[in-house]
């Protein structure tokens, strides 16, 4: 499978909720600018996957032009079917044992100063894919020591052993997205559990790692829901936060319930800072990897040391 194969970009597919002017931005497949060509060639030549493509991220052009990308490990088939997500659901293939090496070589070749690693849920694996994350981190440190590493992880079913495997590799930032408010979990992401995700985040923070999470709006949440979610995240050790607008990936996905106005995202950013979060990215097109390198360097003084 060619991970760079063209696919329809995210758009509003709910006719009852018109696409507002502030969401009408160009999100077409990238053209062949020099920076885009470099990233595309790297990913394609090493047979890698990026979440930029697999999840139809609206910031693909912007990030690839900056020579940044989020690598998606462990294949492109997920064992969970979340209603908001564009990653394919099904039975995954066995892990590719050479993938960590290829990712590390790609990071080295691109000269990245900050890399984000994520993965599909691999509930078919005993450790949920934690060892695969750890090996990739270790390989990157071997080939490109100056690159800082952020991981965006599944919940690993809150397994202590899986989390410890990840910790041993010493990534700089560990992100686990809460995604939505507690009341919507049964509908939006029934194979996940709100309190379990909070437990995972607290576990990460308690082990000294800079802890990050994110929420998407427009799924039917109330302001009270969002405020409580932010309070919960902070209480469980999260200090880096992203807040973005949900975009319906396809006709079978959960429909957009509302488009949150830009000034409301500003309000939530101000609220989050008042709660105590250290860095907050909040806006209609913000995603969990949005300007991750810049936010990392803002917070580098509180990262764990080797």
Swiss-Prot record:
Residues spanning the signal sequence: none
Required co-factors: [4Fe-4S] cluster
Record field: transmembrane: none
Localization per Swiss-Prot or TrEMBL: Cytoplasm
Pathways per UniProt: Protein modification; protein lipoylation via endogenous pathway; protein N(6)-(lipoyl)lysine from octanoyl-[acyl-carrier-protein]: step 2/2
Chemical reaction(s) catalysed: [[Fe-S] cluster scaffold protein carrying a second [4Fe-4S](2+) cluster] + N(6)-octanoyl-L-lysyl-[protein] + 2 oxidized [2Fe-2S]-[ferredoxin] + 2 S-adenosyl-L-methionine + 4 H(+) = [[Fe-S] cluster scaffold protein] + N(6)-[(R)-dihydrolipoyl]-L-lysyl-[protein] + 4 Fe(3+) + 2 hydrogen sulfide + 2 5'-deoxyadenosine + 2 L-methionine + 2 reduced [2Fe-2S]-[ferredoxin]
Binding-site residues, [4Fe-4S] cluster 2: 78, 82, 85
GO CC annotations on file: cytoplasm
Domain Radical SAM core: 64-278
Keywords attached to this entry: 4Fe-4S, Cytoplasm, Iron, Iron-sulfur, Metal-binding, S-adenosyl-L-methionine, Transferase
EC number: 2.8.1.8
Name of the top EC class for this enzyme: transferase
Cofactor detail note: Binds 2 [4Fe-4S] clusters per subunit. One cluster is coordinated with 3 cysteines and an exchangeable S-adenosyl-L-methionine.
Record Pfam families: Radical_SAM
Binding site for [4Fe-4S] cluster 1: 52, 57, 63, 289
InterPro entries: Aldolase_TIM, Elp3/MiaA/NifB-like_rSAM, Lipoyl_synth, rSAM
Source domain of life: Bacteria
Annotated disulfide bonds: none
GO molecular function: 4 iron, 4 sulfur cluster binding; lipoate synthase activity; metal ion binding
Sequence similarity: Belongs to the radical SAM superfamily. Lipoyl synthase family.
Protein name: Lipoyl synthase
